[in-house]
Amino acid sequence: MAGAVKTPIGNVIEVASDRTGYRKYRSITDVVCNGPRDDTLVPPNVLSGTQLTVSDALVRDTVGARCACDARICVEGDVDLSTGILMRRGTVIVTGRAGMNSGALLNGGTVIVRGDADAFAGIDMKSGVLVIGGTPQGYLGANKRGGTIYARGATALPPSKALAVTGNDIALVSRHLGISQLHAMMFKKFV
């Protein structure tokens, strides 16, 4: 493609173009699950095995969509809509804020948002884990049928139930968010 790209750009990452004057993009999910093939990622983004670190400061949506492999995608910054939508395996870590519908239709895998999450995080979730380190906005886990959400400062929407975190839950939240176990005790487990 030629010209400028407006954000959010979707579940894509720039690779070196084979055509002068053009930019080339590939699906993030395809790159982490099937490798870069003959393509080279454009710095500062780095792929090491099945771990992708996205640090180019571009806001994306649907990061990790439909991931079905044991990949790890770390976005250093904010993301927009539907992070981890329809994931079955793998992990997406967002160090900043996440837009609406993070973890929507999650069917396995793990989505970790270290910042705030906008409304409808975990909507229609079937299985997997969603961890929100900041403040979740309204309708957390709306119509959730399975899986687990860890958050604080939120209330359960039926059919979900809010439970106190236990030893294993505290360790999981502490590990994923890089916080003390004492701080992790303030979280709730939504099942």
Positions of PLM-derived features:
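Intrinsically disordered, low-complexity terminal regions
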Residues: 1-63, 70-72, 95, 114, ...
